[in-house]
Design a protein with these regions (language model features):
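Hydrophobic anchor at the beta1->P-loop junction of P-loop NTPases
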Residues: 19-21
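Short phosphate-coordinating micro-motif centered on Lys-Gly-acidic
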Residues: 81-83, 89-144
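N-terminal pre-Walker A segment at the start of P-loop NTPase domains
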Residues: 1-8
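Conserved lysine of the Walker
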Residues: 29
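P-loop (Walker A) phosphate-binding loop of NTP-binding proteins
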Residues: 24
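Post-Walker A helix-loop "phosphate-sensing" segment adjacent to the P-loop in P-loop NTPases
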Residues: 38-50
């Protein structure tokens, strides 16, 4: 199910869009990102690459033909100075940004899609809620 949603979002995303992935460790944030990036690579006829969690690197970049995807993990960010050094929120950045742990920092990005993942009571199932802002404000999870 997460793969289908990541594919639908990938079909509708454009440069400068931002996807916030919110949820506990192991709930599926990096899995969503892997599905999203591999789907874009497949659509563009680019060889699929391994998509890892950027917990220790803070950032992995993926160039997919004329599209750039920047995958951030803010789990280890301690202050705004460290965040500024990453340059995530610079307006001139024309990449799609996927950000894990965005709730650890304050941001007011206009065009962002928030995916809230949490564990379900059922084994290995997850619950997903989606909130859109800016161009995504009218997003309906049932349409995905």
């Amino acid at each position: 199910h997460l793969r289908l949603i990541s594919n639908k979002i990938a079909d509708n995303v454009s440069e400068k869009d931002c996807i916030f992935l919110i949820g506990e460790i192991g709930v599926g944030k990096t899995t969503f990102t892997r599905n999203f990036i591999n789907y874009l690579q497949k659509q563009e006829g680019v060889e699929e690459t391994e998509v890892l969690s950027p917990t220790f690197n803070l950032l992995y970049e993926y160039d997919i033909k004329n599209l750039k995807v920047m995958h951030y993990d803010l789990y280890r960010i301690k202050n705004n100075k460290e965040l500024d050094q990453l340059g995530i929120f610079k307006e001139d950045l024309s990449a799609i940004k996927i950000i894990e742990w965005p709730e650890l920092v304050e941001t007011n990005l206009v065009n962002r899609l928030e995916l809230h993942l949490k564990y379900s009571n059922k084994d290995s199932e997850r619950e997903l809620s989606i909130t859109g802002h800016g161009k995504w404000k009218d997003i309906n999870k049932n349409e995905l």
